[in-house]
A protein has these predicted regions:
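Conserved class I S-adenosyl-L-methionine
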Residues: 1-51
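A generic alpha-to-beta junction signature in SAM-dependent methyltransferases
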Residues: 49-50, 93, 142
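Class I SAM-dependent methyltransferase SAM/SAH-binding core
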Residues: 56, 62-107
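A conserved beta-strand element that flanks and buttresses the S-adenosyl-L-methionine
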Residues: 118
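Short catalytic micro-motifs in class I SAM-dependent methyltransferases
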Residues: 121-122
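A short glycine-rich, Lys/Arg-flanked "PGG" loop and its adjoining helix->strand segment in the class I
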Residues: 132-144
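C-terminal alpha-helical "lid/dimerization" subdomain adjacent to the S-adenosyl-L-methionine
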Residues: 151-198
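Conserved Class I S-adenosyl-L-methionine
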Residues: 184-220
């Protein structure tokens, strides 16, 4: 794990910085996604997860996962804060009934309930200070009997990230093809610690490794019918 010393502004700047990074990255996002050698394993993991009914995808990006969800869902809503990402996602999903919402998930309020909320590599972008509020929002968005389904990076990914030191919110530096540098929240979990944290927040969670670098999980509100 690499680390540099830099003072980074605290909340709420982390959110706008993160959105700015993904807005700038939109044009090159698909190239990096398509070069990921682990994608077949992740898609197989998705096949084992209970994605069905009315589905909400949080942080849909350019729609790479959206296109895998649409046939599993009765209805599909895809949310992202970056208009440049959504423009590509809308083009990708043209001809489907996918509903797109441009909103910052940290200030968004759902206008309906969902059977499944899907998070692909988003949970690691939720800072610890927002974790409880975020999962309260997830509970609010779920229909009774619904679940949160997620895929994400494990702690092993720390060896390839450049973490910025002296920040209250765990932050990594990312460089784009044009040489510009950006900051994003990055919180890495292992399966046992994330399971424990979600249990403490009132969820029945089951998190399992997919490989050395990724995990998949399902979480349901404790006591849900």
């Amino acid at each position: 794990m690499h680390s540099t010393r830099e003072q980074v502004p605290e909340e709420p700047d982390w959110s706008q910085r993160q959105i700015g990074y993904y807005r700038a990255r939109a044009a090159e996002y698909d190239k990096a996604h398509n070069e990921r050698t682990h994608m077949p394993r992740l898609v197989r993991a998705l096949d084992e997860l209970p994605v069905s009914g009315d589905v909400l995808e949080v942080a849909c990006g350019t729609g790479q996962w959206t296109q895998l969800l649409v046939d599993r869902a009765r209805s599909l809503t895809a949310l992202d804060a970056a208009p440049e990402m959504l423009r590509i996602a809308r083009d990708r999903m043209r001809g489907t009934t996918t509903r797109f919402i441009e909103a910052d998930i940290f200030t968004w309020e759902p206008d309906r309930l969902y059977d499944t909320v899907f998070l692909a590599f988003w949970l690691s972008h939720v800072p610890p200070v927002e974790m409880e509020a975020f999962w309260n929002l997830m509970r609010w968005a779920l229909r009774p009997g619904g679940c949160i389904v997620f895929l994400d990076d494990s702690t092993a990914k720390a060896e390839i990230e450049e973490f910025v030191a002296e920040t209250r919110v765990p932050t990594v530096r990312r460089m784009l093809a044009d040489g510009s540098q950006h900051l994003a929240v990055k919180v890495l979990y292992d399966a046992p610690s994330l399971t424990s944290q979600l249990n403490d927040l009132g969820w029945e969670a089951h998190v399992e490794p997919i490989d050395a670098y990724h995990f998949a999980g399902i979480a349901r509100p404790r006591g849900s019918e």
